Curated annotation (Swiss-Prot):
HAMAP family reported in the protein's UniProt record: EPSP_synth (MF_00210)
Keyword field: Amino-acid biosynthesis, Aromatic amino acid biosynthesis, Cytoplasm, Transferase
PANTHER family, alphabetized: AROM/DEHYDROQUINATE SYNTHASE, PENTAFUNCTIONAL AROM POLYPEPTIDE
Metabolic or biological pathway: Metabolic intermediate biosynthesis; chorismate biosynthesis; chorismate from D-erythrose 4-phosphate and phosphoenolpyruvate: step 6/7
Record-linked CDD domains: EPSP_synthase
Top-level taxonomy: Bacteria, Pseudomonadati, Pseudomonadota, Gammaproteobacteria, Enterobacterales
Catalytic activity: 3-phosphoshikimate + phosphoenolpyruvate = 5-O-(1-carboxyvinyl)-3-phosphoshikimate + phosphate
Domain of life: Bacteria
Catalytic-site annotation from UniProt: 313
Protein name: 3-phosphoshikimate 1-carboxyvinyltransferase
Source organism of the structure: Photorhabdus laumondii subsp. laumondii (strain DSM 15139 / CIP 105565 / TT01) (Photorhabdus luminescens subsp. laumondii)
Binding sites annotated in the UniProt record for 3-phosphoshikimate: 22-23, 27, 169-171, 197, 313, 336, 340
Sites where the protein binds phosphoenolpyruvate: 22, 96, 124, 171, 344, 386, 411
Length: 428
């Protein structure tokens, strides 16, 4: 296995231009495929998850043209349902942002499609989405373990009244919302339990609006969707920078700035993970917002106790930032860490202990007390891009850190370590 040793970083300063958002990129690709007319997507993320979506769309007969650097994509929309004549198997890696929406999309009309992926994908639950789609008439079979991929999707979803559990992943609701306007009948989606990661639903609704479809909802509990609608291309769509990826550079500035300015997101961003900057501010960092940037300056950091259900990905960065804050930090209401690329609660607790932190791992929370001095460690990344990027922050101490399998950042930010190095200064 490859490894990367990061030597202690004494100072962080500069500007980072963010790659496109994974969440926005894959939603936009699917809506562009559904839409009437061609759509030119710019600042598309070039990463493993996006490649899986692009490969799947190509296999399903959607034509598109990519720029040489893969950040601009012109998609020829089909103006309706995505159907495929004859059986086909689509391999989606560990891309939840491809698996969940495509499951719903391919339930429209008639299909004969198998959706599969890496071993970890087969451990990530999808039963709540399948249950909801079946309520609307879809025919879906589990090919291995009940409630988990791989799936055999045959179509049949016509809409109607559907109940979906909101407690595990907002991607289930996103998948239903994007597919429902194309169903034969009107749909009424009822949320059971507390809806996690609500800002990600706002991303979905904003994107759908850009493609001509508006959805009404009652306090995120019941969503009303007219059937037999058509998505219409906006012509051009600019993909925002990835707010989750911004978190590492903003946290680095809070710990060892200098000042870091992140461009590609701003005060009017679609993404809930921009709220991460507000959390850093509560901890003591200095934050400044512009229309298309956010800037962080070093401050004296103190621990916090917060519900971070709305920013689960960026909350991971708070867990490693806590190593540099006075007192304990508690991150609450994050059960859905357990069903991400790995069981992130267990992984985070395990690796934080390696660097000397005192950690209490609860079912849906983590309590972190930093050590007087961080210990050198080899950090396991669990094939999880965010684990690798979060633990790079350990190098902001006077202790080196070794990141195992650093290439796993290719899922969302292939160039991450080069960009971190560009902003870093070390004692000569």
């Amino acid at each position: 296995m490859q490894s990367l040793m990061l030597q202690p970083i004494s100072y962080i300063n500069g500007t980072i231009n963010l790659p496109g958002s994974k969440s926005v990129s894959n939603r936009a690709l699917l809506l562009a495929a559904f839409a009437k007319g061609a759509t030119c997507l710019t600042n598309l993320l070039d990463s493993d998850d996006i490649r899986h979506m692009l490969n799947a769309l190509a296999a399903l007969g959607i034509s598109y043209r990519l720029s040489d650097d893969r950040t601009c994509c012109e998609v020829d929309g089909i103006g309706g349902l995505i159907t495929h004549q004859g059986p086909i198997e689509l391999f989606l890696g560990n891309a939840g942002t491809a698996m969940r929406p495509l499951t719903a999309a391919l339930c429209l009309g008639k299909n004969d499609v198998v959706l599969t992926g890496e071993p970890r994908m087969k451990e990530r639950p999808i039963g709540h989405l399948v249950d909801a789609l079946r309520q609307g008439g879809a025919e879906i079979d589990y090919l291995e373990q009940e409630n988990y991929p791989p799936l055999h999707v045959k179509g049949g979803f016509v809409g109607g009244k559907v109940m979906v559990d909101g407690r595990v992943s907002s991607q289930f609701l996103t998948a239903l919302l994007m597919a429902a306007p194309l169903a034969e009948n009107d749909s009424e989606i009822h949320i059971q339990g507390e809806l996690v990661s609500k800002p990600y639903i706002d991303i979905t609704l904003a994107l759908m609006k850009s493609f001509g479809i508006t959805i009404n909802h009652d306090q995120y509990q019941i969503f009303h969707i007219k059937g037999r609608q058509q998505y219409v291309s906006p012509g051009h769509y600019l993909v925002e920078g990835d707010a989750s990826s911004a978190s590492y550079f903003l946290a680095a500035a809070a710990i060892k700035g200098g000042t870091v300015r992140v461009t590609g997101i701003g005060k009017n961003s679609l993404q809930g993970d921009t709220k991460f900057a507000n959390v850093l501010e509560k901890m003591g960092a200095k934050i400044r917002w512009g229309d298309d940037f956010v800037e962080c300056e070093r401050g004296t950091l103190t621990g916090i106790d917060m519900d971070m259900n709305e920013i689960p990905d960026a909350a991971m960065t708070i867990a490693t930032t806590a190593l540099f804050a006075a007192g304990e930090t508690v991150i609450r209401n994050i059960y859905n860490w357990r069903v991400k690329e790995t069981d992130r609660l267990h992984a985070m607790a395990t690796e934080l202990r390696k660097v000397g932190a005192e950690v209490e791992e609860g079912v849906d929370y983590i309590r972190i007390t930093p050590p007087p001095r961080l210990l050198p460690a080899e950090i396991g990344t669990y094939n999880d891009h965010r684990m690798a990027m979060c633990f790079s922050l350990v190098a902001l101490s006077d202790t080196p850190v070794t990141i195992l399998d650093p290439g796993c950042t290719a899922k969302t930010f292939p160039d991450y370590f080069n960009q971190l190095e560009r902003l870093s200064q070390r004692k000569s």
